[in-house]
Amino acid sequence: MHAKFLDTLDWGILIAYFLILIAIGIWASSKRKKGSSLFLAEHSLRWHHIGFSMWGTNVGPSMLIASASAGFTTGIVSGNYAWYAFVFICLLAFVFAPRYLGSRVSTLPEFMGKRFGQSTRNILAWYTIVTILISWLALTLFAGGVLIRQVFDIPMWQSALILLIISAFFTMLGGLKAVAYTNVYQMILLILVSAALAIVGIYKVGGISALTDAVPADFWNLFRPNDDTAFPWLPIILGYPVMGVWFWCTDQSMVQPVLAAKSLKEGQLGTNFTGWLKILDVPLYILPGIICLALFPQLENPDEAYMTMVTHLFPVGMVGLVLAVLTAALVSTIGSALNALSTVFTMDIYVLSLIHI
């Protein structure tokens, strides 16, 4: 396996990262792993576990690529999807979470089944499994494979397989608790490295004023005219709520950390913490794309904006750290999806099939 951008120091940082990650996973696995303790972490998650876990599930590699690409092509307007999400995250905290936790369910199909019958539960269980397989696992593994392939000279399927094995290791080892605890460590690392990338980029451009002069003026507009082909303001205001309620309030992969909260208060605090973390999406993920346009206007593929910034601005050692961060985002998203998938399959399909035998 040949690494295109990695030096000895980069490899050392990568190895150290995985050793720490494995230690956290083993520690979390020392807890009981039966029934709800495996899938819902024994209802022991505190607000910071919930907040970082939800944000980590959302901040996958596809989002990193897409956010930097959007910043490169259109500026901060795509940040509406991050900042507007606060409304629906609050909706989860104050409307949905009390009902979910009050009913003491393990999955959202189970919650709907209690209200509307077993047929509804069965339909939603299979729908949830298909959704996780396609929109979470397949797309995340593909995006992760693209990123890993840029660094290692290995086929796409091998990249995806490696990521799947690493994520499955933590999910099977300690269940949701292992995923949640490693998410705290991984997301703090992601914030620090992404902030360093933005700061170094601004310095290379020559400061904030130089950056604003180097890109089109409308790159700093949060709303664009309704005849804009990329981001008209009306669909953002009226269309996003439909997707926002589904994604933040009813998607099993996103909501599962809330179901595992130690109490309703912890669940609500953690959910609100996620909303505050979403504010960071613009400076950490979209801004590097804008900086990339200022530094590398000749770049043909906007999807390469993030890795272009990394490989051109960071010294030896930092590239390995960034790769560790990208792996962190991958492991976080895939691990959460695998845990949600196994929870729904076990609780809503397998267990019920045994009852009816």
Cite the ranges covered by each PLM segment.
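Loop-to-helix junctions at membrane interfaces in multi-pass transport proteins
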Residues: H2-L6, L40-H49, A66-N80, G113, ...
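Membrane-embedded alpha-helical core segments of multi-pass
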Residues: I20, M63, F88-V95, R104-V105, ...
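Transmembrane alpha-helical segments in integral membrane proteins
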Residues: I22-G25, L238-M254, T327-S336
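Hydrophobic alpha-helical segments and their helix-loop junctions in multi-pass secondary transporters
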Residues: I24-K31, I134-L137, L141, G145-I162, ...
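Helix-loop-helix junctions that connect adjacent transmembrane helices in secondary transporters/permeases
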Residues: S67-L173, P257-I355
